[in-house]
């Protein structure tokens, strides 16, 4: 066998070595270029400036990105949205003088808003801190110089005094001692009588407690309703009512002597007519009317201006259908003049004309969470709701329409010129309010 000649083998070896050297040089040159010009991150565009900052700042940026977005809601009748809380709002209360709105949230603050700013572009609030706890319920004192809250973790009442400053704001100071713990079940509502004589607290079992302002229990009411779903003090301060699993609303009178001393709590009357458990109820501003909503899918308006001591029962004035109440919990608010009934289920609000029993307005997906509280201001001009980190205020157009209907009816029967002038003035004011909101029916 012949072997290859030596010159040919040497030439082939030199060619292979030269090719390997060229390839190595090309790879090394590519690495050098990569080091001179680092590649852009995938999430960063070519022209985007490089982000700088410390590790702590980057962590804070990540936290802000994870913060839930504020729920967006718009409607022609939305008057304002109050946004200062960083946590979900659970309760609201208008002061008796109509100047302030108190809100509490799980961000450990209570905020006091000025009602005169509602229609302004900016809504300022004053903050009261709830130390080492947060409030779930809040109520103004009758003189508007204090408010009480229910503490979520402490399971008791705390009183805050409001001291007016020279600049028009307030300084908030919690009293040294909270009320003693008495309830054994979760609290559903609290209240202060407009007379300032007593405080009410109600829990989800069957207990309603009547306290004096010093934190002493005056009376314990057993509602015998299997469980309580709502309880409230009447605006006249004479009555305390409750509703729950049973198909009725029970009302008691809190009796005081001529010298202001507490005497007793007596059963006054009941609202009977529903066929299932009652979700909620409310008194009118003069305590002469009441409204209730039940799991039987109806709401009812009652005349409670009766001589209950002579065994006279309240009169049923109107029954309306509300099927949503038969499948889910429902909140209720009655306008001060009883012309409008607001019902809330989930995140939606329905407004009814109580004279005709018809639904007039519907607000859908008002909040990002289920509506926690619903109330009219003391003038009946606005309806307020909360359910996330904002309070939403609506113009009460059904209330203005009800005034128009009522004044037109009364004008036909007016006998004196002075009466006609007064009624015509109220009619004109209501029509102008509707016109300004674009809600005047032609």
From Swiss-Prot:
<dbReference type="InterPro" id="IPR001680">
    <property type="entry name" value="WD40_rpt"/>
</dbReference>
<dbReference type="GO" id="GO:0030968">
    <property type="term" value="P:endoplasmic reticulum unfolded protein response"/>
</dbReference>
<keyword id="KW-0677">Repeat</keyword>
<dbReference type="InterPro" id="IPR020472">
    <property type="entry name" value="G-protein_beta_WD-40_rep"/>
</dbReference>
<feature type="modified residue" description="Phosphothreonine">
    <location>
        <position position="428"/>
    </location>
</feature>
<feature type="repeat" description="WD 7">
    <location>
        <begin position="366"/>
        <end position="404"/>
    </location>
</feature>
<feature type="repeat" description="WD 1">
    <location>
        <begin position="84"/>
        <end position="123"/>
    </location>
</feature>
<dbReference type="GO" id="GO:0051219">
    <property type="term" value="F:phosphoprotein binding"/>
</dbReference>
<dbReference type="Pfam" id="PF00400">
    <property type="entry name" value="WD40"/>
</dbReference>
<dbReference type="GO" id="GO:0071456">
    <property type="term" value="P:cellular response to hypoxia"/>
</dbReference>
<dbReference type="InterPro" id="IPR015943">
    <property type="entry name" value="WD40/YVTN_repeat-like_dom_sf"/>
</dbReference>
<feature type="repeat" description="WD 4">
    <location>
        <begin position="224"/>
        <end position="263"/>
    </location>
</feature>
<dbReference type="InterPro" id="IPR019775">
    <property type="entry name" value="WD40_repeat_CS"/>
</dbReference>
<feature type="cross-link" description="Glycyl lysine isopeptide (Lys-Gly) (interchain with G-Cter in SUMO2)">
    <location>
        <position position="164"/>
    </location>
</feature>
<dbReference type="GO" id="GO:0042149">
    <property type="term" value="P:cellular response to glucose starvation"/>
</dbReference>
<feature type="repeat" description="WD 3">
    <location>
        <begin position="182"/>
        <end position="222"/>
    </location>
</feature>
<dbReference type="InterPro" id="IPR042410">
    <property type="entry name" value="WBSCR13"/>
</dbReference>
<keyword id="KW-1017">Isopeptide bond</keyword>
<dbReference type="GO" id="GO:0019901">
    <property type="term" value="F:protein kinase binding"/>
</dbReference>
<feature type="repeat" description="WD 5">
    <location>
        <begin position="273"/>
        <end position="312"/>
    </location>
</feature>
<feature type="repeat" description="WD 6">
    <location>
        <begin position="323"/>
        <end position="362"/>
    </location>
</feature>
<keyword id="KW-0832">Ubl conjugation</keyword>
<feature type="compositionally biased region" description="Basic residues">
    <location>
        <begin position="52"/>
        <end position="65"/>
    </location>
</feature>
<dbReference type="InterPro" id="IPR036322">
    <property type="entry name" value="WD40_repeat_dom_sf"/>
</dbReference>
<feature type="region of interest" description="Disordered">
    <location>
        <begin position="36"/>
        <end position="71"/>
    </location>
</feature>
<dbReference type="GO" id="GO:0005783">
    <property type="term" value="C:endoplasmic reticulum"/>
</dbReference>
<keyword id="KW-0597">Phosphoprotein</keyword>
<feature type="repeat" description="WD 2">
    <location>
        <begin position="130"/>
        <end position="170"/>
    </location>
</feature>
<dbReference type="GO" id="GO:0031369">
    <property type="term" value="F:translation initiation factor binding"/>
</dbReference>
<keyword id="KW-0853">WD repeat</keyword>
<protein>
    <recommendedName>
        <fullName>Transducin beta-like protein 2</fullName>
    </recommendedName>
</protein>
């Amino acid at each position: 066998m012949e072997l290859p000649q030596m010159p040919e083998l040497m030439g082939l070896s030199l060619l292979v070595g030269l090719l390997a050297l060229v390839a190595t040089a090309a790879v090394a040159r590519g690495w050098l270029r990569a080091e001179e010009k680092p590649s852009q991150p995938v999430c960063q565009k070519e022209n985007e400036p490089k982000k700088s900052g410390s590790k702590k700042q980057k962590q804070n940026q990540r936290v802000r990105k994870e913060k839930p977005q504020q729920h967006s809601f718009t409607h022609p009748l939305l008057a304002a949205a109050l946004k200062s809380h960083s946590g979900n709002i659970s309760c609201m209360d208008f002061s008796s003088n109509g100047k302030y709105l108190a809100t509490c949230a799980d961000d450990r603050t209570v905020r006091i808003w000025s009602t005169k700013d509602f229609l302004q572009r900016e809504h300022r609030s004053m903050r009261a801190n709830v130390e080492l706890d947060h409030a779930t319920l809040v109520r103004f004192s009758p003189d508007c110089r204090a408010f009480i809250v229910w503490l979520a973790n402490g399971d008791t009442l705390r009183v805050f005094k409001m001291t007016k400053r020279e600049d028009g704001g307030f300084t908030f100071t919690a009293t040294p001692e909270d009320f003693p713990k008495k309830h054994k079940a979760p609290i559903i509502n609290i209240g202060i009588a407009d007379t300032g004589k007593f405080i009410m607290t109600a829990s989800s079992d069957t207990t309603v407690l009547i306290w004096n302002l010093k934190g002493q229990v005056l009376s314990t009411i057993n509602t015998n309703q299997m469980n309580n779903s709502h309880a409230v003090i009447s605006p006249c301060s004479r009555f305390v009512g409750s509703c729950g699993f049973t198909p009725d609303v029970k009302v008691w009178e809190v009796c005081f002597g001529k010298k202001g001393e507490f005497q007793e709590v007596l059963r006054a009357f009941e609202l009977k007519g529903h066929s299932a458990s009652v979700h909620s109820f409310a008194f009118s501003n003069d305590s002469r009317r009441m409204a209730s909503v039940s799991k039987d899918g109806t709401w009812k308006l009652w005349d409670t201006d009766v001589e209950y001591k002579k065994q006279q029962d309240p009169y049923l004035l109107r029954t309306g259908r509300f099927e949503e109440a038969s499948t889910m919990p429902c909140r209720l608010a009655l306008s001060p003049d009883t012309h409008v009934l607001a019902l809330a289920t989930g995140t939606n609000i329905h407004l009814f004309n109580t004279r005709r029993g018809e639904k007039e307005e519907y607000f859908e997906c008002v909040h990002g969470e289920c509506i926690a509280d619903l109330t009219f201001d003391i003038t009946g001009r606005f309806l307020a709701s909360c359910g996330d980190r904002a309070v939403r205020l609506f113009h009460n157009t059904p209330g203005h329409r009800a005034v128009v209907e009522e004044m037109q009816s009364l004008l036909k029967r007016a006998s004196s010129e002075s009466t006609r002038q007064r009624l015509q003035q109220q009619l004109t004011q209501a029509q102008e309010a509707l016109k300004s909101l674009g809600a005047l029916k032609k």
